[in-house]
Amino acid sequence: MINAIRTPDQRFSNLDQYPFSPNYLDDLPGYPGLRAHYLDEGNSDAEDVFLCLHGEPTWSYLYRKMIPVFAESGARVIAPDFFGFGKSDKPVDEEDYTFEFHRNFLLALIERLDLRNITLVVQDWGGFLGLTLPMADPSRFKRLIIMNACLMTDPVTQPAFSAFVTQPADGFTAWKYDLVTPSDLRLDQFMKRWAPTLTEAEASAYAAPFPDTSYQAGVRKFPKMVAQRDQACIDISTEAISFWQNDWNGQTFMAIGMKDKLLGPDVMYPMKALINGCPEPLEIADAGHFVQEFGEQVAREALKHFAETE
């Protein structure tokens, strides 16, 4: 049994711009004793489903500006919190967090909720993991919205990931340092540094799931998993590259936060070349790493693109 802790509910009281009702699963196969949280908004009987995957060090709060737009279109919107994040349980041992631990959770969630006609919405680790999902069951996936994300493979052979891991010191090196080094990580301060457009209330909401460092094992582990990729991650991600190049026939929309020092245009344009049929991206000049902070614009532009090209 995995040793995990649960963020007290009162930490999530009266969060700014987060009026959504919680949903939980506590019996997913392979995760005994762990309770997972997800949002389930919009029309529960809709044919189309938007599956919105957050990254590091965020949670479903990241999609607060996109969920209403997707829901207004008549679709169902699912936004899970990875284990270690948001309202989901948080294993306290960093060793419990692996690429397959997170990926298999997403696959189990999709199967349990029987999600179909999925528009996959990804950014950061939501992309590292999410971009490996469609090849597992392509019939479930219909469209892709990708924002500042890539696949973690071999940087020698893949330009997108190479651009990510070979950045100047103010890129991934600084990001990892800010998350891994502090003995008392203040995630509200971290978010304000990397997303300066945030209000104090928004930054505090991002930090709500993490009352102290004992809740932050998942946050600390993600950057280490980039620096030291396990073989399963490399193998699965390499297989996914072939899928997106050769087998993907769905609609795609790409948005790039142009100020991102991690997964900005140097990463995203090689990703565009990798994804079959990917159109010219929406470049958002003022957006950094957390593109979803400009999410209403991205969501509306994506829906418009899908309607015009369907």
UniProtKB/Swiss-Prot annotation:
Keywords, comma-separated and alphabetical: Detoxification, Hydrolase
Cross-referenced HAMAP family: Haloalk_dehal_type1
Similarity comment: Belongs to the haloalkane dehalogenase family. Type 1 subfamily.
A Pfam family of this chain: Abhydrolase_1
Pathway listed: Xenobiotic degradation; 1,2-dichloroethane degradation; glycolate from 1,2-dichloroethane: step 1/4
GO MF term (any one): haloalkane dehalogenase activity
Function according to Swiss-Prot or TrEMBL: Catalyzes hydrolytic cleavage of carbon-halogen bonds in halogenated aliphatic compounds, leading to the formation of the corresponding primary alcohols, halide ions and protons. Has a broad substrate specificity, which includes terminally mono- and di- chlorinated and brominated alkanes (up to C4 only). The highest activity was found with 1,2-dichloroethane, 1,3-dichloropropane, and 1,2-dibromoethane.
Coiled coil location: none
Example GO biological process: 1,2-dichloroethane catabolic process
Domain AB hydrolase-1: 49-295
Thermal behavior of activity: Optimum temperature is 37 degrees Celsius.
Amino-acid positions noted as binding chloride in the UniProt annotation, renumbered to this chain: W125, W175
Summary of pH dependence: Optimum pH is 8.2.
Catalyzed reaction equations: 1-haloalkane + H2O = a halide anion + a primary alcohol + H(+); 1,2-dichloroethane + H2O = 2-chloroethanol + chloride + H(+)
Subunit structure: Monomer.
Record's keyword annotation contains Hydrolase: yes
NCBIfam families given in the database record: PRK00870.1
Organism, scientific name: Xanthobacter autotrophicus
Gene responsible for this protein: dhlA
Protein name listed in UniProt: Haloalkane dehalogenase
